[in-house]
Amino acid sequence: MRRNHTRTYTNRRYLDAVEDHIVIFDGAMGTSIQRYNLTADDFGGEQYNGCNDYLCITRPDVIEAIHTSFLDVGSEVVETNTFRGNRLTLAEYGLGGRVLEINRAAAQIARRACDQAEARTGIPRFVAGSIGPSGKLPSGSDPDLSNITFDELADVFYEQAQGLVEGGADLLLIETSQDILEVKAAVVGINRYFADAGVRIPLQVQVTLDTTGRMLFGTDIASALATLEALPIDVIGMNCSTGPEYMRAPIEYLVENSVLPISVLPNAGLPINVDGEAVYPMEPDPFSEMVAEFARKGVNIVGGCCGTTPEHLAQLYRKVHGHPFNALLSSSQSDAQSTHFVRRRPRPRQPQREARVSSGMTATLMAQNPGPTMIGERVNSQGSRKVKQLLLAEDYDSIVQIAVEQVQAGAHMLDVCVALTERDDERQQMEALVKKLAQAVDAPLIFDTTEPEVAEAALALYPGRGIVNGNNLENGRERIDRVLPIVKKYGAAVLSMTIDEEGMAHTRQKKYEIARRIHDIAVNEYGLSPEDLIFDTLTFPLTTGQEELRGDAVETIEGIRLIKENLPGVLTCLCLLYTSPSPRDS
């Protein structure tokens, strides 16, 4: 799938390195801290004991020494000691008001270590601002863990990004992500900070999969890729959770399908319990061999997570690049600089470029092969008397059952409309239904509404990549200029009808001209990709008997042909209701 993300960076040195050669990250910060056997006094007192992030204030020497230990064995990128450095997790230690201070200090420590290593060897080093989970799970149903809004989460990550960038980070790393909806909020919050601050550095996102290949709420790697690739990020990957042996299948999928660079930072195997402590048993040699294999298959960035030590990374450098990094340290600076040209280049990839949407569990091709893509329309208050009555009764569970039955009958996506003339709480009903549907059906959802704020409310709750339906030019640009920013913000796709100020288009040329207007606004002004756009060319029922509409079906078919020929990449759809005299509920 081709993305239309044209970005100007204030610092893109890291991406330059990724394009040039396989980049090696560091290993485990937590494991390294444990080796120091620190006491409560090192953490600043008993109340802060165990808050690793606070060591950036109380023991910056320890954190800098850990960074240096990885830089000395060939790591080009070190992660800041800020994995739990957001206001929600720091608040557990009474440090929620010191987010900027802690993150800024952490980035400055890593920056100092990287600059010194670069001065010693002549090899560029990079600071990755580590951003871990918030501790909330917005996709879930737990009343405590899910009790946070999308915008509140975005604010949490905005603040942490600010501290890291101000401290000198070269890139930001959202890592160990278990809830894809939280990741979306983090990406939105970070990009809002970039816009407000007038800066842009690369954004790398890494999800965590269990041994079955899924995130905490069942999201597989295909869904994660479809959801995240539509957002303004620069690298996608995986880290933590399992050792490298369980990452093979997801990595193969990313290599075959991701247009973005790929990162893989596994644990040193699955943890085992030894005397009440988690121990990661994988030794440096087998770990480095398996991870180097990923690099040979097309992964761009490798490193380690829990349990990985400088020994693991030294071996990884040697197996990826074919020589030990220590040899560089004994060379002159000019010799070290020359090794830049012998580092292994990334294996060229030719990913499949197919537009996808996703539920919170899996991805769906927007253009099925063989076609057509079937959109179920029974979860629709405007098209189903039964659903209308269920909405009036607020019987959402029965509506979910209808949705499940439509998916079982072959629907690839579901159109969801809850608008009722009898009620004025469309937003609240959409939110209630989307929350239940997201957990019950694996078909992606289409949010069918004339109200942009209702569409945004749905997207803010939806863990996958959805579609917004109801876009048109009926009132000129009034609607489109409200809808497209929302589509862009959440990485959604958009379904637009060929309606303009003069009404519904009847001729092939008029249908195409309206589609062209919408296409040009969406692509050239809002930065959407053609693959994000679906056009419903509309037609009247073939059985109207009205003479002036006799040729409507032919004009619709030819309008589709014109759109396909002249707007490469866009998709089209048509409601089968209008080609059949059957009742709407059939």
Task: Label each residue range with its predicted role.
Residues 27, 70, 110, 172, ...:
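Conserved, mostly hydrophobic/aromatic
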Residues 578-585:
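Conserved small/polar residues in nucleotide/adenosyl-binding loops
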Residues 308-361:
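Terminal amphipathic helices with adjacent charged low-complexity linkers/tails
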Residues 50-58, 71, 77-99, 169-185, ...:
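Glycine-rich, proline-tolerant flexible connector loops at the mouths of alpha/beta enzymes
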Residues 95-118, 184-205, 254-266, 316-325, ...:
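Alpha-helix-loop-beta-strand connector modules within alpha/beta enzyme cores
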Residues 24-26, 78-80, 127-129, 174, ...:
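Hydrophobic faces of well-ordered beta-strands that scaffold small-molecule active sites
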Residues 17-58, 83-90, 121-152, 201, ...:
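N-terminal small/glycine-rich loop or linker at the start of catalytic domains
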Residues 143-171, 178-203, 217-260, 288-293, ...:
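Alpha/beta enzyme core
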